[in-house]
């Protein structure tokens, strides 16, 4: 009896919390207990969700107490689609998407130059993207030709980059810029002829101005620019982790390759990884993954594996997304199919009527690996729904949680096909805010009704999961900030509030639904809903405290809400 009493008493002591949040408006995203006032955390798990009064028994002299002063507490955000390595380059490097004048061009380059280690190349840039969007649709060659694009000169930056090579590109990758240091390293001088398939713009004296065009420019410099060092890549990754903490992102699904996974494992081993990673391989790597025993659920709560990715069409920005009917602005253009869509050829030279995608998908699915496929246009999304039918016939109906990546434009008749198909609509709502400016010009009003159709997807039975697609494309920046995605899903307006009622307002989601899509549904998408995604006793202690209550403020103000505190794995990692 004495032993039992001591054991019971020890159990009570063990339940004292390391961290308690009280006086909060806790929105749990847990239907069994949607609201609370307080949360208690021990180690890295939530041990209590309930009232201010009841949480007191979890507090002792060692408990870190956070008084939320009525602020909104949510589960940490889970971004369903991030290109982490590319985001590193944007967050720490040169972003010129909105630059098309000399002063900001110089200022941005100077800022990066002062932050970078001596001798490291400055690359990227993508200048004049917003200039193109604001002037006209870049999908129409005739109109695009009228734009007087900004053309930088090496003399703008040579004075402070004498020992720093710079090689950057315009957003359309048809014009490049190099400073004097980079030109010298490349052997492009006044006295040398232009390299093959490269046009070097020169002044009246024959000196290179810094502007390069031609089909071989990128390849030529790729052979010169050294790969980023391990130390540089670690530094960049740590910078993005801080960026995530600032925005309350505690989990993300990464599209980067194995090199970035090496960085994640290194940071994890050093106890510096402050975001849970769901990392995807490529579809054609399924067999190697299977041989290594990798399948759905492989890994741990910090780095999760078991998903592969593929692409079947292009993007809206350059009119390569695949549609059943031609683009409205170009009657000869239907978009493209990626090579993976071509019929599979067996080793004996025979031809299988399945696409290579379908052949590989059946194999990977049979091996217990989750599939995720990029599809933008209605024909691309329609094909994947057809493929899902055949996948069910071939491998049987199961809880495969097929990730339909982007699902940007869906035909009206295809929405009903999502029901009972175990499909994750892996969408990025900020795309809507960005693309609505020109979508109807590209595909017309009727087809646009099925674009970024969050409500129709939700009501169809698909599990709608949200993310950012950070860092974006060569024509647009997609920030990691979840508030912009939530704003887009709830208002369907541009950041300056247009149109007044929202673009196709029937497709809006409620604030509660949008929060669920950015938390619990993204956890469900990676088979992790039992360990994270809601503020539930027993789940991982990843939490955010916001400056304003998303459930009470005018939806137009959501984009301006800030994260006050981010808690990851039971530890405060960001405080405003």
Ranges and model annotations:
Residues 1-8:
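Sec-dependent signal peptide recognition
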Residues 83, 302-320, 422-433, 491:
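Non-cysteine beta-strand/loop elements that form the S-adenosyl-L-methionine
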Residues 17, 37, 531-534, 563:
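Short, conserved secondary-structure segments in the cores of folded domains
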Residues 562-576:
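Short peripheral tails and domain-boundary helices/loops at the edges of structured domains
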Residues 16-22, 27, 31-292, 306, ...:
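Divalent metal-binding segments
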Residues 267-271, 294-303, 395-397, 418-422:
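Acidic (Asp/Glu)-rich catalytic clusters
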Residues 362-372, 379-402, 406, 412-416, ...:
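His/Asp/Glu-enriched, well-ordered alpha-helical/loop segment
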Residues 8-17:
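Bacterial Sec-dependent signal peptides at the C-terminal "C-region" and cleavage site
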């Amino acid at each position: 009896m004495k032993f039992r009493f001591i054991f019971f008493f020890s159990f009570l002591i063990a339940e004292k919390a390391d961290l308690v949040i009280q006086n909060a408006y806790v929105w749990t995203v847990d239907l069994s207990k949607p609201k609370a006032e307080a949360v208690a955390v021990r180690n890295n798990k939530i041990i209590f969700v309930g009232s201010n009064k009841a949480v007191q028994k979890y507090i002792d002299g060692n408990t870190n107490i956070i008084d939320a002063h009525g602020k909104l507490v949510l589960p940490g955000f889970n971004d369903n689609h991030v290109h982490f390595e590319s985001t590193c380059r944007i967050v720490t490097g040169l972003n010129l998407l909105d630059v098309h004048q000399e002063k900001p061009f110089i200022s941005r380059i100077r800022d990066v130059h002062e932050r970078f280690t001596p001798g490291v190349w400055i690359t990227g840039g993508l200048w004049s993207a917003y200039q193109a969007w604001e002037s006209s649709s870049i999908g129409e060659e005739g109109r695009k030709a009228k734009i007087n694009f900004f053309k930088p000169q090496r003399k703008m930056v040579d004075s402070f980059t004498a020992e720093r090579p710079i090689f950057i590109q315009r957003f359309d990758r048809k014009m490049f810029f190099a400073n004097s240091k980079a030109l010298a390293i490349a052997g492009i001088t006044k006295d040398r002829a232009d390299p093959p398939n490269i046009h070097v713009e020169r002044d009246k004296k024959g000196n290179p101005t810094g502007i390069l065009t031609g089909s071989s420019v990128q390849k030529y410099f790729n052979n010169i620019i050294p790969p980023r060092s391990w130390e540089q890549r670690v530094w960049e990754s740590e910078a993005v982790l801080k960026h995530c903490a600032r925005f309350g992102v505690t989990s993300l699904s990464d599209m980067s390759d194995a090199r970035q996974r090496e960085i994640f494992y290194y940071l994890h081993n050093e106890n510096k990884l402050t975001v849970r990673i769901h990392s995807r391989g490529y579809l054609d790597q399924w067999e190697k993954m299977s041989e290594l025993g990798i399948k759905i659920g492989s890994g741990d709560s910090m780095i999760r594996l078991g998903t592969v990715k593929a692409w079947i069409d292009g993007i809206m920005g350059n009119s390569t997304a695949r549609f059943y009917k031609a683009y409205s602005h170009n009657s000869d253009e239907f978009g493209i199919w990626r090579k993976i869509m071509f019929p599979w050829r067996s080793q004996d030279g025979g031809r299988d009527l399945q696409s290579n995608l379908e052949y590989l998908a059946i194999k990977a699915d049979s091996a217990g690996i989750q599939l995720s496929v990029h599809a933008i246009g209605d024909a691309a999304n329609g094909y994947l729904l057809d493929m899902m039918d055949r996948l069910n016939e071939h491998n049987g109906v199961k809880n495969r949680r097929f990730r339909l990546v982007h699902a940007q434009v869906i035909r009206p008749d295809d929405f009903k096909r999502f029901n009972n198909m175990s499909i994750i609509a892996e969408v990025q709502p900020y795309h809507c805010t960005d693309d609505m400016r020109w979508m109807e010009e590209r595909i017309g009003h009727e087809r646009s009704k099925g674009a970024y159709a969050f409500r129709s997807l939700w009501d169809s039975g698909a599990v709608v999961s949200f993310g950012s697609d950070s860092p974006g494309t060569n024509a647009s920046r997609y920030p990691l900030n979840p508030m912009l995605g939530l704003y887009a899903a709830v208002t369907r307006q541009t950041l300056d509030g247009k149109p007044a009622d929202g673009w196709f307002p029937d497709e809006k989601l409620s604030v509660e639904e949008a929060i669920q899509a950015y938390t619990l549904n993204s956890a469900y998408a990676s088979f992790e809903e039992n360990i994270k995604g809601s503020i539930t006793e027993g789940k991982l202690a990843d939490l955010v405290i916001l400056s304003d209550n998303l459930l009470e403020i005018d939806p137009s103000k959501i984009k301006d809400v800030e994260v006050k505190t981010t808690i990851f794995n039971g530890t405060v990692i960001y405080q405003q």
